[in-house]
Regions:
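Alpha-helical transmembrane segments and their immediate juxtamembrane cytosolic regions
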Residues: 1-227
Length: 227
């Protein structure tokens, strides 16, 4: 990406800030709180408000992962694999059915966002780039991935405006407020930890973070069955 922002990643590298591991922890905790609310206590709206913080952070981290991974294809395959593995736990926890195709888990959205960045980066023409955006976002809506086309566009906005922290925060916040509205507007709170990102990696236990997603859904499903 060309251009310089007032505050680049290098400028924000300091002892004060959040590394990638810390952001993952925040996203994970807020996601679990959100799912506790959605699955066990839907009447407690505050849990869902806290949970709105999770997706923008995951979207941001996928964009950073795209830039830092040594192998984008393996990264995409990993996201797709966990999307498939997580679908039954996701459907059981949210609908009580083994497979329900009306709503797919967020790993499909993250995969689609990564796919869009990879395809877009390979295009040299405006027409080719536009086709990539339309094709992948349409795919997201067709398979009914979590957050749909807008979720994919949020990931893409973090990619396009990566070097301008204020612009990407403004655009992503605008999407959450105007495209989703209501409770989802509280996703703008995710801008705070994202703005504190210092560009550093931190502890590397990515498979643990991936594995917790289907496992916590299964645990919540079993708790719901026992209640």
């Amino acid at each position: 990406m060309s251009g310089q922002s007032a505050f680049s990643l290098e400028d924000r590298r300091s002892s004060f800030g959040l590394n990638s591991f810390a952001l993952k922890c925040i996203a994970l905790i807020t996601m679990i709180i959100d799912h506790v609310g959605a699955i066990l206590y839907p009447e407690v709206g505050g849990l869902r408000i806290i949970g709105r913080i999770a997706f923008p952070i995951y979207a941001f981290l996928v964009t950073e992962g795209f830039y830092h991974t040594k192998n984008v294809k393996k990264y995409m395959l990993r996201l797709l694999l966990f999307a498939i593995v997580s679908e039954i736990p996701f459907d059981l926890a949210l609908t009580g059915q083994i497979l329900e195709f009306g709503h797919q888990n967020v790993f499909f959205t993250l995969f689609a966002g990564l796919l869009l960045m990879e395809l877009y980066s390979r295009q040299t023409s405006s027409a080719g780039r536009l086709i990539c955006i339309l094709a992948v976002t349409t795919l997201g809506d067709l398979i009914r991935s979590d957050y749909g086309a807008w979720g994919i566009l949020i990931i893409f906005c973090f990619y396009v405006f990566r070097e301008n922290i204020w612009l990407k925060m403004l655009v992503v916040s605008g999407i959450h407020i105007f495209a989703f509205g209501s409770v989802q507007s509280f996703a703008v709170l995710a801008c705070i930890p994202i703005a504190l990102y210092n560009g550093e990696k931190g502890a590397n236990i990515k498979y643990a973070f991936y594995g917790i997603y289907p496992l916590h859904l299964l645990v919540l499903y079993m708790i719901k069955q026992a209640m």
